[in-house]
């Protein structure tokens, strides 16, 4: 189910990004050996006292040359739309400013829980200066120091008090939830309509637990599905409707509720950098992934075109080498019937569980084929492996020294697992652990 979302809002230069980095810590770093996988730090995961959440740094949203107050309003709009709790950041050294009051008016009308933080209170003597902030109307201000990390515990304690209770979505456990993500105008809505137009539709739109997404349940061949559609959302201001970062925010909320993610590309326009960013989030999520090339009817082609396009996808999306590719046209509905069987296949792969003895036979055969690496005279020894999770399949490999498992050898082991067990459309995680 979706994690609660905290948004950090405030005028420029109050330290929003510093607090964001303090809260997410090492989670901002992306450990990925394949070049070209770009990440946007606007949205990341955090954890506090067993509370997991996602956090938005609205300071990472670039409005361009809009007037100052317009920027603030639009920044707050993102927070109001996306967040369960808002941290309203101010600067204790500056006192209450007119811009702070402007933000306060917007947030006050939102009816969202707001926790007021006064940053840059770097020593106890400065605490006596924060009482003016009561005038903003959000109760007790929390003095913090982004530079030194002071006061963040109390701030997060208060934010966690406002997290919504986790509710089940009401669908059966066997129901496959899939979302369509992609930049604007790649044809997500058209594809949803094409899928629904072919099948018996259960006529009910259930409002999802994620704001701005509509769940559409339907059945095919006795199986139940839910399409989590991010394409039918109400229009935002023109500035945000055109910014790629806002598209990413919407996609992330849909991914979190999905079993399978369809990364939709525009076959006519080809691949651009934003496609790679959005696909990267699908990969990072650990969900099963299918790459869908839409508008294939509009592409001038011969017998080599599809193969060339597939090779181009593989070159750009090396990190999604496990994801199957489906070419179709939502407009003409050509090949759309091939999509659901692929969704079924990757969803099944996502839940594969391997018996421990069979798993270890494959691992030991792999080691015999390609001996483990050495580093500074020490050789990696693999004692045994076990599967600890599904969705995605996750394996713990017990070794003499986890530091000796180089990413290239880990990749080799993953490839051997795929050759042996399939794992079509699903990432595989391998965790090296020292044997006691």
Swiss-Prot record:
Gene Ontology biological-process annotations: ribosome biogenesis
Positions of GTP 2 binding: 182-189, 229-233, 294-297
GO MF entries: GTP binding; ribosome binding
UniProt cross-references to InterPro entries, sorted A to Z: G_ENGA, GTP-bd, GTPase_Der, KH_dom-like, KH_dom-like_a/b, P-loop_NTPase, Small_GTP-bd
Binding residues for GTP 1: 10-17, 57-61, 119-122
UniProt domain KH-like: residue ranges: 352-436
SUPFAM superfamilies linked to this entry: P-loop containing nucleoside triphosphate hydrolases
Residues of the EngA-type G domain: 4-167, 176-351
Signal peptide: none
Domain of life: Bacteria
Gene3D superfamilies, alphabetized: 3.30.300.20, P-loop containing nucleotide triphosphate hydrolases
Sorted UniProt keywords: GTP-binding, Nucleotide-binding, Repeat, Ribosome biogenesis
TM helices/strands, residue ranges: none
Family classification: Belongs to the TRAFAC class TrmE-Era-EngA-EngB-Septin-like GTPase superfamily. EngA (Der) GTPase family.
Physiological role: GTPase that plays an essential role in the late steps of ribosome biogenesis.
Subunit record text: Associates with the 50S ribosomal subunit.
Name of the featured protein: GTPase Der
Record lineage: Bacteria, Bacillati, Bacillota, Bacilli, Bacillales
